[in-house]
């Protein structure tokens, strides 16, 4: 299973994070499938490759809670229309 999660970069006391698509069994610093974004909590900057993120989500990738909050704040899910079916 693939997850969208944060990968820590930077130096001590000055962390920046890459948002990556990675296999769920890999370590936090393990080899990722693709880098799909960047997040700097100190400067509060975010860069997202939205087409790549939506592609991974459509293929079944699950974002972690923190990545979900970042994507929600950036309004990525407004572009991704969930197709819901009702069963009576």
UniProtKB/Swiss-Prot annotation:
Q: Which gene encodes it?
A: rps16
User: Biological process GO terms, please?
Assistant: mitochondrial translation
- Highest classification ranks of the organism: Eukaryota, Viridiplantae, Streptophyta, Embryophyta, Tracheophyta
- Parts of the chain that traverse the membrane: none
Q: Which InterPro entries match?
A: Ribosomal_bS16 (IPR000307), Ribosomal_bS16_CS (IPR020592), Ribosomal_bS16_dom_sf (IPR023803)
- What's the source species for this entry? Silene latifolia
Domain of life, per lineage: Eukaryota
Spell out the subcellular localization from the entry: Plastid, Chloroplast
Q: Which GO terms describe its molecular function?
A: structural constituent of ribosome
Q: Name the chain's protein.
A: Small ribosomal subunit protein bS16c
Principal subcellular localization? plastid
| Annotated PANTHER family | 30S RIBOSOMAL PROTEIN S16, SMALL RIBOSOMAL SUBUNIT PROTEIN BS16M
